């Protein structure tokens, strides 16, 4: 019961639409193409350094162990079949526990939790990567991106957001600045880089909060 409540707190606003903007175009959140955020691994097909945070498959946002000031815009929990990489089957996805249970009842694979998290990353001090940070909001430039997290990455990002939402229910997640960082993890003979979100004491600027509310259609 507690898990369900936490999920609703974090993701309740992700499906609402945007009102008509000054361009006169009726826009819905689903109509917006948000670039992907990835953490480069040894097997990644990218020239970026291993462990770096990559935006839109092109821009290196930060090297490993270097926090990026970030606002969490939205987060949505889901479930998918835990199919090994060597298999050719495409995992089926569910966005509710009932849908996940229905898939699990007929699947040979276990269902595993994952999340889609939309982040507003602030341009670091001294960064000249202006092409990546094309959203001027208040006194800073930002990049709006989305990251898909599962397993260890799910625990170090979405679960921390959900815990904050449950324990600080009167404080919107987007009102706080979070440190977004790529960290090296090891298990046995395997080593990889894992995304992590940690809340800070810094409050988000009023302009940023207004942007997020407008984006979510609040």
What is the meaning of each model-derived region?
Residues 85-97, 152-157, 169-175:
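Short linear motifs at secondary-structure transitions and domain/linker junctions
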